[in-house]
Regions:
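Amphipathic, Lys/Arg-enriched alpha-helical "gate/interface" segment within cytosolic domains
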Residues: 2-132
């Protein structure tokens, strides 16, 4: 599945891998629209396959809005995320990772099983831990 800069790039027996690539959308409404389309379909795909782990490779380029990050990550359920799924995001670019870490921390504090990493191997190791 591919919507804008968001693509499911692989599925294994227990992990769906998602790639965010290209230029970051400039306007928050563009980002929100893309997320509203992508995540409900991805969540449904995971449910239909019995998959409870998602690896997100965030390779977006460009400016990142801390306001958007905060608003998005405090409303994950409204965007189609599922609390029964564990999400690991890999962001190699330090500035983007620092800003996204705020959103991930807020979501985690709200009970979401979500983490952020600088390397794929660390994210995969975390995803492999037993689910609650």
């Amino acid at each position: 599945m591919h919507i804008g800069s968001l693509t499911i790039v692989s599925e294994t027996a227990d992990i769906v891998t998602v790639l965010f690539s290209g230029e970051r959308r400039v306007h928050d409404f563009e980002k929100i629209e893309e997320q509203w389309e992508f995540w409900p379909a991805t969540t449904q795909r995971c449910r239909s396959l019995g998959i409870r782990r998602v690896l997100v490779l965030n390779e977006l380029e460009g400016e990142i809005s801390s306001t958007y990050v905060r608003d998005f990550h405090t409303n994950l359920g409204k965007f189609g995320f599922d609390r029964e799924i564990r999400y690991a995001m890999v962001v190699r670019e330090p500035r983007a990772r620092a800003i996204l870490s705020l959103g991930i921390a807020l979501a985690s504090a709200d009970g979401w099983d979500i983490g952020i990493f600088s390397e794929v191997s660390a994210a995969q190791e975390w995803l492999a831990q037993p689910l609650p």
